[in-house]
């Protein structure tokens, strides 16, 4: 039986065509240029719409570097992505679900993350929930800015 999960859910509406948003946000190798928190993203395996990769964060002030392997399954037709950590580190488990929904003002990108921290982890479920929730908002705002700039650049070229 799996422990009760902590959960965060955040969304942002991005004024860009779905195809552009999908392509940019699912180009894992380019995540260090999309997200501010990643120092490196290494593709380990890719089979069709499934990618296994290693993410490495920028070093913490004390020099500690966090890195882990995740697997991501992209379903463009249904506009969803499911991911989980393969190397769980301080997490007992981490499951992530991304959805993309067309709205009148753009595409709503939603991230739902369910997880549970291991005993002895640097943060408990409540602390990690607060950290993930705060950081998701920062990263989504950055992605919105970068994807909307790319959409404007593409629209400018198309004229």
Across the structure, where does each feature detected by a protein language model lie?
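Amphipathic alpha-helical segments that line or abut small-molecule/effector binding pockets
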Residues: 19-22, 137, 141
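Short, contiguous strand/loop micro-motifs
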Residues: 16, 126-127
């Amino acid at each position: 039986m799996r422990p009760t999960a902590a959960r965060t859910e955040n969304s942002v509406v991005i004024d860009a065509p779905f195809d552009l948003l999908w392509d940019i946000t699912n180009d894992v190798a380019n995540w260090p240029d999309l997200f501010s928190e990643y120092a490196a993203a290494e593709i380990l395996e890719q089979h069709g719409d499934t990618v296994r990769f290693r993410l490495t964060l920028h070093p913490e002030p004390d020099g500690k570097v966090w890195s882990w392997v995740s697997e991501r399954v992209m379903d463009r037709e249904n506009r969803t992505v499911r991911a989980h950590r393969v190397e769980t580190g301080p997490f007992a488990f981490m499951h992530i679900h991304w959805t993309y929904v067309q709205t009148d003002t753009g595409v709503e990108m939603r991230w739902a993350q369910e997880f549970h921290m291991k005993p002895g982890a640097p943060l408990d479920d409540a602390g990690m929930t607060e950290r993930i929730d705060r950081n998701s908002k920062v990263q989504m705002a950055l992605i919105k800015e970068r994807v909307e700039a790319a959409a404007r650049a593409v629209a400018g070229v198309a004229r």
